[in-house]
Amino acid sequence: REPALAAHLRERQLGWDVTDFGLGDFARQGLTLFCVRNGKQGDPSSLPYAEKLLFVGEGQVTPFHAHKVKTEDIIVRGGGNLMVAFSRDGSFADGAVVVDGRAVADPYAQPIRLRPGQSVTIPRGVQHSFWGEEGQGDVFVAEVSQANDDLTDNYFRDGIGRFAQVDEDEPPHRLLWNDRA
């Protein structure tokens, strides 16, 4: 109904995003996101930052991936604990991983447990994966980063995709950001 608004939302990838990374098992490997703010990468007249809300199910994994452009902070806002693992395999940088202002000595040794209120800074180029810790419930997470482009700045270690194929078996109640014309 509002083409200019729809174009603004789509260009900035604002709104709902639900993915199973093309793997077909959302409960085990999936993520629900809502992009609240986002600029356009490379556009100096645009916001230089992005903010997303992430809803991570208990045991639900976001597979290993890295970003060439953005550095991001992952902040656990509530619910259970978030487990974050790092891998040198597929990484194209080796920056310092920082939890609440303290550098992690060897982030690749074992997953980091983030409790509500804690955060981790993930440098660009570092492969990372996260999931809700088993037995602790679903996790409400915020991501604050440089302007984000999910179409071009996600590099999955295992060659999977970022977006799901949606089976449109009924009319949508809420549009995903990439459903807007």
Language-model features: locations:
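Conserved metal-binding segment of the jelly-roll/cupin
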Residues: 57, 111-146
